[in-house]
Amino acid sequence: RRSSSAASDVYKRQEGNPLDRNNEWKNITCPLTGKKAVRETDTFDTFFESSWYFLRFLDPHNEKEMFNKKFKSWLPVDQYIGGVEHAILHLLYARFFYKLLRDEGLVDDDEPFVSLLSQGMVLKDGAKMSKSKGNTIDPDDIIKKYGADTIRLFILFAAPPEQNLEWSDSAIEGGYKFLKRFWKLSYQIRNSYDVPKDKDNKILIKHNETIDKVSTDLFERKSYNTAIAAVMEFFNSLSRSVDEGSISYESAKICISTMAKLLYPITPHICFTILSEIKAEKASNPEWPDKIEGVD
């Protein structure tokens, strides 16, 4: 192995291929024949590998094939997420390689990705957040103060994913206060109280409407901010009903459980704790909530 100083001499900015100038690396003894040999110095462009990484990840330890054909049933990729530059460069090359592999019978589909989501950038005072600009935020400091769930909630609530997000400390504080209210109400309804169930119908209608809204926004529209807004609106309605004593304990518990399940992909830590506190059937990775039948 060359010393770092010797290697730096070889790789100084010069015309041509730096590997071709590294004689110690290039000229070797063949490990199979014992004869003198010359290593290949041409290299692939980075896109040659990155254009089909999603295929290799299906079968990363296969030493005989790119990937086993049994994994074709997993294709095409359901969701491609990347920055705007991906839509011009990587997406173009990935589609090119995929069509080549299709022609060779390695895949069956014409396109590698079903859906594309190009997310926006994070801005600070209107400028792109980057290390070179010195305007980045240390996530560890924010997490220590507010918790990881608060940061996750803020990032997904502050703007639609395809738009730029303006970093705002005050908005983080707002998300933190909402989660504190959510926890407080959840803790409150652990203690059984009851009122006539015929007063529950209005909030249970809201319960079903919220499940429909959040399901559509998350899984079809990829509109995470409006999904969170729908849960917050539902929470405010439930909070008023509890304060007014116009909802039964069982219905309030159902509503809290549903909200925790709807927010679980976004704020998993507090939702797990809430589901545990109200003794939900499954607190870890719960099933998506069902609508209540017979409510209209």
Task: Annotate each predicted stretch with a short phrase.
Residues 1-7, 11:
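Single conserved hydrophobic/aromatic residue that forms the stacking wall/gate
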Residues 30-33:
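Short cysteine-rich clusters marking metal-coordination/redox-active sites
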Residues 38-43, 80-83, 123-148, 162-173:
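Conserved phosphate-binding loops in nucleotide/dinucleotide-binding enzymes
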Residues 49, 56, 91, 95-104:
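Alpha-helical support elements that line or immediately flank enzyme active sites
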Residues 55, 105-125, 129-131:
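Catalytic cores of enzymes that engage adenine nucleotides and/or redox cofactors via long glycine-rich
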